[in-house]
Design a protein with these regions (language model features):
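A short, well-ordered alpha-helix in the C-terminal region of glycosyltransferases
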Residues: 295-309, 318-321
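Conserved acidic donor-binding segment of nucleotide-sugar-dependent glycosyltransferases
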Residues: 258, 272-280, 287-294
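Aromatic "clamp/platform" in nucleotide-sugar-dependent glycosyltransferases that forms part
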Residues: 235-237
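Membrane-proximal helix-turn-helix segments that form the acceptor-binding/catalytic region
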Residues: 99-119
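Short hydrophobic beta-strand element within catalytic cores of glycosyltransferases
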Residues: 245, 253-257
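Active-site donor-binding segments of glycosyltransferases and PAPS-dependent sulfotransferases
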Residues: 3-75
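Nucleotide-activated donor-binding/catalytic signature segment of Leloir-type glycosyltransferases, i.e.
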Residues: 194, 200-223
Length: 336
């Protein structure tokens, strides 16, 4: 069946991995002769921007409309019968309090999730939190995980003399302050991709940490960063999924991540798990990665096998199955 899908995105974002996810899905769909296009809302995600988007944004004509993430409030105005909304995480709620938190929870998650018929979450953890927040049944939210976005390029050898620890992302949930404390005194270089706060920059200088810093990288730069990394850290306090886990595994790096959902499930046994709120736990994990070559080799190999389940063709197939279900339901309603 030939049909068209329109992916709807935010105007700008601090987490480009979300946009990369659905471009990978769209590439797979296009190879099957399914029409895809992307449109962005005209305004940002401030309170005024949200209400202007709700008032003024109208999606182009398409068989399937897919709210691709972090503009989930559009589910309040989009047609229910052929709209899918993907929820990546609810981390924004942890960064707000009082009336602002209440309003964001209602606009982004509660009201649109109750109104729309088709919802997906990128992990079981996000699904669980969404159904608790919105008060909706579990069967309404389909879990479709994120695909691996970069090509697998296994590292030739772990650098014993000058290992690089890669951290992609510096949002508050990424736990960079504790990571900085944890690498202090360890024989490694820290490569951070993302904007650092004044406090983080000062702390890096005070601790005399050897730093590689890139505020932003294009896709080629990200791929090179993973190829160069010996260790990839994602010791976040909270995640919707955790793409750096599988991106590190695909490139033969040893991954260190949090012993929390969904990160430990995404890692599939191919990572060192640490307590993200304990600097010593993170430091011990990095120290073990640097010193225990047998454990390192075994963990990297488990990670290499783990990434196969995130093949982009398989993830696209799951979205295609959902789209076909929506179209069948539409056809059934027309024939009544």
């Amino acid at each position: 069946m030939t049909f068209s899908v329109c992916f709807i995105e935010r105007r700008e974002g601090g987490s480009p991995s979300i946009e990369r996810v659905f471009r990978a899905v769209a590439d797979e769909l296009s190879s099957q002769k399914i029409g895809t296009r992307f449109v962005s809302v005209p305004y940002g995600n401030g309170i005024l921007g949200i209400f202007l988007n709700l008032l003024l944004f109208r999606p182009p004509q398409a068989d399937i409309l897919h709210i691709a993430g972090h503009v989930n409030y559009l589910g309040l105005t989009m047609p229910r019968a052929n709209t899918v909304s993907t929820i990546h995480d609810l981390t924004i709620l942890d960064l707000r309090s009082g009336f602002r938190r209440w309003l964001i929870e209602k606009l982004f998650f509660v009201w649109p999730s109750r109104r729309l018929r088709y919802l997906t979450a990128i992990s079981k953890a996000t699904q669980t939190r969404l159904i608790q927040s919105a008060g909706i049944p579990e069967e309404k939210v389909r879990v479709i995980e994120n695909p691996l976005l970069i090509a697998s390029s296994p590292k030739q050898a772990f650098s014993e003399t000058d290992p690089i620890v890669l951290q992609v992302g510096t949002a508050p949930n990424k736990n960079v302050e504790r990571l900085i404390e944890a690498v202090s005194g360890l024989p490694c270089r820290l490569h951070i991709v993302g904007k650092l706060s004044v406090h983080e920059e000062r702390r890096i200088r005070e601790l005399n940490i050897s730093l590689i810093h890139d505020e932003t990288l294009d896709d080629a730069g990200i791929e090179k960063a993973y190829r160069d990394a010996d260790i990839v850290t994602l010791c976040s306090t909270d995640e919707g999924f955790g793409l750096p886990i599988i991106e590190g595994q695909a490139n033969g790096a040893l991954v260190i991540t949090s012993d929390r959902s969904p990160m430990k499930e995404v890692a599939g046994g191919g990572a060192i798990l640490v307590d993200p709120e304990d600097v010593d736990s993170i430091k011990n994990g990095i120290s073990a990665a640097l010193s225990d070559s047998e454990m390192r080799t075994n963990t990297i190999e488990i990670g290499r096998q783990n990434v196969h389940r995130f093949d982009r063709a398989e993830i696209a197939r799951q979205y295609l199955s959902l789209y076909n279900e929506i179209l069948r339901n539409l056809e059934g309603n027309r024939s009544k």
